[in-house]
């Protein structure tokens, strides 16, 4: 735990006791502050009370006593409309912050020079965060991993000079962290997302920009217009900007050419790494993630040799292009995290042909219409869930398909068909382009079911990572 000593002897209001809220409350109290916490969910309030946290309805509180108001990132700050607790805080003139801001203030208070790498972007955040953490940890350095990746940031060990922090930040967390000042900040990409919470793409981009604007080194992917504009603006303001690209050959910066990762400066181009044979980092999207990780680790003082070793041993993340098994020449890949067509596109682009594609669930707007360019790579599709009839119409005569209905049936049929393919490496790919809620509690449960079905097939050799 990171006790928030920067708030010692102050009184703090907190709203939001699900997720990271209870951990945040405990860290505030451990630092010597008083707290009054609340939530709209009575069960969450009861859990907090059982954990020894002082609770009270903030609608009845005297807001003049509060030094700050700590808001859970899951609670609306601005859109579609501010939560009632936000209105009360603003009316009382009380500053509104989140758990990442508390970490930043504590770091500034006790160990301002400890390495702090923060990562954001619409897609690829978690993989990049996990990759950086893996590379650093593999060297034997003291590394703490947290934030939006799933570990509440204030449950980590307290800052000290030689302790590295690798923190994934959502737009919600950045919006509540006005002092965010990482030694290296990464902005991977920007596409429309969470606009119901931010009101417009411009607001969403402006929030993401804050993370890199106050960074010692701003590492920015420039393959979309929003990030390109941010990189240009920050460079013009005198901030150290390092550009990365998975699509463009840069005159100055880091870019990918297939599996080769290159650095260009002053008319010279050097190869700094290769992803050839690293299955956990397959595809152009992972080339961008790897470029960001390399630059961040170099800026933190790691050597290229250390970085290369970490890249090669990276196991990947579950449900994100996760290689779960192989039977003969057939590879089985779990990409259950792909809950829309935009997320499925990188998976389909990662394999040139002979894809046995398991797709379906609860369809999103547009279905798989945007994926038609990848249809020639698909040997056959196996349609599951509510989307089956809709996707069958989209595939039409372009791709052979069957309506499998269930994931278990799809795995069995796809494995048999792929095993009869004469290609050197047919791929059975679960990349559903859909939500999971028609048949599974969440994408993790869907991915687990796929993995279990694959590993239950006779003759399958389990895999994990880059082999």
Curated annotation (Swiss-Prot):
Subcellular location: Cytoplasm
Signal peptide: none
Keywords from the named record: ATP-binding, Cell cycle, Cell division, Cell shape, Cell wall biogenesis/degradation, Cytoplasm, Ligase, Nucleotide-binding, Peptidoglycan synthesis
Primary localization class, coarse: cytoplasm
GO function terms (MF aspect): ATP binding; tetrahydrofolylpolyglutamate synthase activity; UDP-N-acetylmuramoylalanine-D-glutamate ligase activity
Residues reported in the UniProt entry to bind ATP: 121-127
InterPro entries documented for this protein: Folylpolyglutamate_synth_CS, Mur-like_cat_sf, Mur_ligase_C, Mur_ligase_C_dom_sf, Mur_ligase_cen, MurD, NAD(P)-bd_dom_sf
Record field: catalytic activity: UDP-N-acetyl-alpha-D-muramoyl-L-alanine + D-glutamate + ATP = UDP-N-acetyl-alpha-D-muramoyl-L-alanyl-D-glutamate + ADP + phosphate + H(+)
Keyword DNA damage: no
EC number: 6.3.2.9
Recorded metabolic or biological pathway in which this protein acts: Cell wall biogenesis; peptidoglycan biosynthesis
Gene Ontology CC: one annotated term: cytoplasm
Pfam families referenced in this protein's UniProt entry, alphabetically: Mur_ligase_C, Mur_ligase_M
GO BP, one annotated term: cell division
PANTHER family from the UniProt entry: UDP-N-ACETYLMURAMOYLALANINE--D-GLUTAMATE LIGASE (PTHR43692:SF1)
Record-linked HAMAP family: MurD
Biological role: Cell wall formation. Catalyzes the addition of glutamate to the nucleotide precursor UDP-N-acetylmuramoyl-L-alanine (UMA).
Similarity comment: Belongs to the MurCDEF family.
Protein's name according to its UniProt entry: UDP-N-acetylmuramoylalanine--D-glutamate ligase
Native species: Brucella abortus (strain 2308)
